[in-house]
Amino acid sequence: MKKTAYFLALLTGIAPPANATGGMTCRTAGSRPIQVSLVIGHTTGSPLVSGRLMDAGRAIEVRAVQWWLDASELRLLLVDPQATRAELALKAKKNGRFYDGTIVRSGRARWVRCRES
């Protein structure tokens, strides 16, 4: 019994840390930037994603309703809290350490760069 308890304590002490969450920050260029901050929960199956939207320094309440993230592409759709209006659509491709692409907000497309945070 003591050997089993000792062995379990040893295994617990050498277990690697669980990297259960990650994040990305996407930002447009210009004087009135749009910034999207994503928290990505790594789970079995599809990841859980939550997002925060800042438009020219003003926080916009949003919900992430659709997303796609893999080694080569990031896609995201953010809507208002009642899910009646699309607030932002993002589509970006892997470019070295970044994801570069387009954000569409209020009918206007803008270039965006996303970084892991």
Per-range role (PLM):
Residues 22-88, 100-117:
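Central antiparallel beta-sheet cores of small beta-barrel/beta-sandwich binding domains
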Residues 16-20:
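Sec/Tat signal peptide C-region and signal peptidase I cleavage site
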Residues 93-99:
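Short, highly charge-biased, low-complexity peptide segments
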Residues 4-14:
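Sec-dependent N-terminal signal peptides
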